[in-house]
Amino acid sequence: MTISNGDVKSETCNNGSSEKKPFRIFVGYDPREDLAYQVCHHSITKRSSIPVEITPIIQSDLRKKGLYWRERGQLESTEFSFSRFLTPHLSDYQGWAMFVDCDFLYLADIKELTDLIDDKYAIMCVQHDYTPKETTKMDGAVQTVYPRKNWSSMVLYNCGHPKNKTLSPEIVNTQTGAFLHRFQWLEDEEIGSIPFVWNFLEGHNRVVEKDPTTQPKAVHYTRGGPWFDAWKDCEFADLWLNEMEEYNKENKKEADNAK
């Protein structure tokens, strides 16, 4: 990510390939979770065998561009609670793109996820049956409970699907949380299912011994990750911390080389 004078530039990683059009990934960005964003970004590009274009969804930038104007509600735990639904619009309603929260750590090649794409669906996501036990999360934010919770935290959008044109800036800024987070602009059969290992909820999902289909491909620190003091000892904290150390070393090396 490059931020200059408030403008955000997406970054493309093609791992040596320049032929295939990059797969677009929009990552929710919150200023208090900058490190989480950087580590998520690093975990994707490090393992991707296909070109990817990663863009942070930064609320202040969207406001400057006139794409986002709704007031923040008391129950919004992040700055991207609703701006995430601008993904099809930001993709010019063309092709497939992914939105993902910044509190993800990718452990597998994103190509494996794109191989699951089926054009008959308007969106695809992990369809969790999740009721959190905690009353707070992250740095003390209220933990809300609602149907289809966490479905919207990682979504593959078929941006060219006619139904997704419903997600105009006007709708994203005025519709209810229920309408957006429960995908009420779609019929149930228009929502494709993805294996839970691509949105493996820390503290909820479980790895079954000797069952490789339960090994996480993307860990979601939905309750709060090691970048928050209250969650330094959460499950899979070591994986995230190792990724952070690697990111920091590479970042320092790049900075030293630029001197």
UniProtKB/Swiss-Prot annotation:
InterPro entries linked to this entry: Nucleotide-diphossugar_trans (IPR029044)
Molecular-function GO terms, alphabetical: transferase activity
Tissue: Mostly expressed in pollen grains and pollen tubes, and, at low levels, in seedlings, roots, stems, leaves, flowers and siliques.
GO biological process: pollen germination; pollen tube growth
Keyword Protein biosynthesis listed: no
Chief localization: cytoplasm
Effect of inactivating the gene: Impaired pollen germination and pollen tube growth thus leading to disrupted male transmission.
Localization of this protein: Cytoplasm, Cytosol
Keywords from the named record: Coiled coil, Cytoplasm, Fertilization, Germination, Transferase
Coiled coil start-end: 236-259
Entry GO terms, CC: cytosol
Function recorded in the entry: Probable nucleotide-diphospho-sugar transferase required for pollen germination and tube growth.
Protein name: Protein CDI
Gene that encodes it: CDI
